[in-house]
């Protein structure tokens, strides 16, 4: 993980367009989301990461019983997130993608979990609240505290967010989207 973390920091330092975007959009920390589309070719470690992600996404799409009509899902986007203290990623989804995910590079203590929202929530259905000890998969929100090196995958329509980073240290992750 140390090598990929060093690559993230090095790319962040060199990415003037990304730094400018973060400043203009009051993003606390750094993201390459709006500036770099070539991370796989920029650093050999990202090329190796792509091979690992391809395997995980292939297995995950099989478990989802997708009918891909013989086609493979392709890595469409990959970007670095360095979330500083006080920063967050507001609730969002990933349009025009099939599978999205994140690999966790640095997760200091007190850093925020990722929060997934039950997709029925915005439908405003008349449903009673859940019991405090309800099964996790029945709750309106699920929080996951990933470990360093973990890769989380989800279908891109699933709304999610990263609440405020309460750690004084940066939370580093690499996010990605797969599509046709």
Locate each region found by the language model.
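A short coil-to-beta-strand element that immediately follows conserved catalytic motifs
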Residues: 66-78
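A generic structural micro-feature
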Residues: 70-72, 93-97, 166-170
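Short N-terminal helix-initiation segments at or just after the protein's N-terminus
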Residues: 20-26, 38-50, 95-96, 115-125, ...
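Non-heme Fe(II)/2-oxoglutarate
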Residues: 1-67, 88
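Catalytic core of Fe(II)/2-oxoglutarate
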Residues: 133-180
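A short local structural element in Rossmann-fold oxidoreductases
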Residues: 5, 115, 163
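Hydrophobic residues positioned within well-ordered beta-strands of beta-sheet architectures
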Residues: 76-78, 99-101, 172-176
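Catalytic core of non-heme Fe(II) oxygenases with the double-stranded beta-helix
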Residues: 80-153
């Amino acid at each position: 993980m140390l090598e990929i973390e060093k690559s993230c920091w090095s790319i962040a330092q060199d990415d003037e367009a990304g730094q400018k975007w973060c400043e203009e959009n009051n993003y606390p920390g750094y993201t390459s989301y709006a500036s770099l589309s070539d991370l796989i070719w920029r650093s050999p470690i990202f090329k190796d990461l792509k091979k690992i992600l391809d395997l995980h996404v292939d297995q995950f799409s099989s478990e989802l019983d997708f009918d891909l009509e013989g086609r493979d899902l392709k890595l469409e986007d990959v970007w670095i997130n360095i979330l500083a203290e006080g920063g967050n990623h507001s609730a969002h989804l990933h349009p025009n993608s099939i599978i999205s995910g994140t690999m966790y590079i640095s997760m200091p203590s007190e850093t925020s979990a990722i929060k997934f929202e039950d997709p029925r929530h915005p439908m405003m259905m008349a449903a009673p609240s859940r019991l405090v000890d309800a099964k996790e998969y029945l709750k309106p929100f699920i929080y996951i505290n990933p470990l360093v090196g973990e890769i989380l995958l989800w279908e891109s329509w699933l709304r999610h967010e990263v609440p405020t980073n309460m750690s004084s240290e940066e939370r580093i992750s690499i996010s990605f989207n797969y599509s046709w």
